[in-house]
Design a protein with these regions (language model features):
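Structural signal for short hydrophobic segments within the conserved structured cores
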Residues: 74, 158-161, 326, 376
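Short loop/turn motifs at secondary-structure junctions
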Residues: 43, 156-157, 324, 347
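Flexible, low-complexity linker and terminal segments
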Residues: 2-31, 181-401
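Thiamine diphosphate
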Residues: 1-150, 157, 174, 193, ...
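Internal, well-ordered domain-core segments that constitute the primary functional module
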Residues: 146-190
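Structural motif
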Residues: 97-99, 123-125, 160-162, 188-190, ...
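Flexible loop/turn segments at secondary-structure boundaries
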Residues: 54-57, 83, 105-107, 131-134, ...
Length: 401
């Protein structure tokens, strides 16, 4: 994968990564470290965080690496402070992120939706662990998938990516920052403990092979520019930075093109509709599925993160037995690729959906199937992973549907 720019079709001139920040070469590193390197390559120069297992290694590495490229890390007093501090730095012109896990992710919900409402481009890494509450701090789960999309109050839309390897942690970190800038939304990178802590080969290319989506700088002079007034065909406004002479008003209240609060239904309808449509219009672009053997499939295995690696073995075993089974590995979960799943549901017998939770993304799969095919959930409370033979049994069940 030499570039992640293929899906960025907005007509804006792409930039390249800063060579000072890119550790070009072949490395042996874990997913947390690779995510940090992806953030640096994407241009992140500010990180804020609070230590929490199993995500601590992301900010620990960033704290050491950022000063080498003119960046800064601040360990905050808690996740609340971290998740709002990074947004201040974004409005000051920086690319910024935080990282956390379950309990910290819960604390960040208010500020995630604040970023969605104010259209603040930023990235949240969530290295999921067993829950609820304190749960299993050192063991894997995928129980925060619905929380990533619906965890806060009100109506909003955002993007969530799901890597399944350290190599993909690097590339999806880069992509997360690009998508955050392209759509002016918070982007979640939903890792899990296994992916975050597994150590594998990670190939980092040269800086000129890493394309970066630039900040949408104002096209008008100070005095003429409106904070949310210069909106392109993609429904995403230009963004001014504090300290550049522009008048910027940022509020979590329903607001107009100036950013000023407006307390009426018309303003609410205009704003919320645009926040949704800037994502929904890009459904094809944001459909990120790694598919294999889907041309002749009777059964499609839907998985993501560490579970997809276990599922791959089950698919191999099934095809060796002559079963027509394909892979639909989600690299992007939100927005959910509804169009593609509705298409597939028309021609297969069953979806099989293993997850390290009690059934979350499978609900979207079942909704999109619309009764055209069977949906077989494979819930798992976490702490370990599925057995390939159990997934194989579910595939065989689906093939008999």
């Amino acid at each position: 994968m030499a570039t992640i720019a293929d899906s960025l079709h907005t007509g804006r001139e792409m930039q390249h990564a800063d060579p000072r920040a890119v550790l070009t070469g072949t490395h042996f590193m874990n997913g947390d470290a690779a995510a940090c390197e992806g953030a640096l390559a994407a241009g992140a120069r500010f990180g804020a965080g609070y230590p929490i297992t199993p995500s601590t290694e992301i900010v620990e590495r960033f704290a050491a690496r950022a000063p080498q490229v003119g960046g800064l890390f601040i360990q905050m007093e808690d996740e609340l402070a971290a998740s709002i501090t990074l947004q201040g730095m974004v409005w000051a012109g920086q690319k910024a992120f935080t990282s956390t896990s379950g309990p910290g992710f819960s604390l960040m919900m208010e500020h995630i939706v604040y970023a969605a409402m104010t259209e603040t481009p930023c990235v949240f890494f969530n290295v999921q662990r067993g829950g609820p509450s304190t749960g299993l701090p050192t063991l894997p789960a995928q129980g925060d998938m619905m929380q990533a999309r619906f965890g806060s109050h009100g109506d909003y839309s955002l993007i969530a990516l799901v890597p399944n390897s350290p190599q993909e942690c690097f590339w999806l970190a880069v992509k997360a920052f690009n998508l955050a800038e392209q759509f002016r939304v918070p982007v979640m990178v939903m890792m899990d403990e296994c992916v975050g802590h597994m150590t594998e080969k990670v190939v980092i290319p040269k800086a000129e092979e890493i394309e970066i989506f630039p900040r949408r700088s104002p096209s008008k002079k100070p005095g003429e520019f409106l904070a949310y007034g210069e909106i392109g065909e993609d429904l995403v406004p230009e963004m001014a930075s504090a300290g550049e002479g522009y008048k910027i008003y940022v509020t979590g209240m329903t607001h107009d093109k100036r950013g000023y609060p407006l307390g009426n239904a018309d303003a609410q309808r205009t704003l919320i509709t645009r926040l949704f449509e800037k994502i929904s219009r890009a459904e094809d672009e944001l459909t990120l599925i790694d598919e294999d053997h889907m041309d002749d499939a009777d059964v499609a295995v839907v998985s993501y993160g560490i579970t997809s690696r276990v599922a791959e073995r089950a698919i191999q075993l099934a095809r060796a037995k002559g079963l027509k089974v394909g892979r639909m590995r989600l690299k992007g979960v939100w927005p959910f690729p509804e169009k593609r799943f509705r298409e597939v549901a028309q021609r297969i017998k069953a979806f099989v959906a293993p997850e390290l939770n009690m059934g979350q993304v499978v609900l979207e799969v079942e909704r999109c199937a619309g009764g055209h095919c069977r949906t077989i959930a494979m819930p798992h409370p976490g702490g370990t992973v599925h057995r390939p033979l159990d997934i194989l049994a579910a595939i065989e069940k689906g093939a008999r549907a």
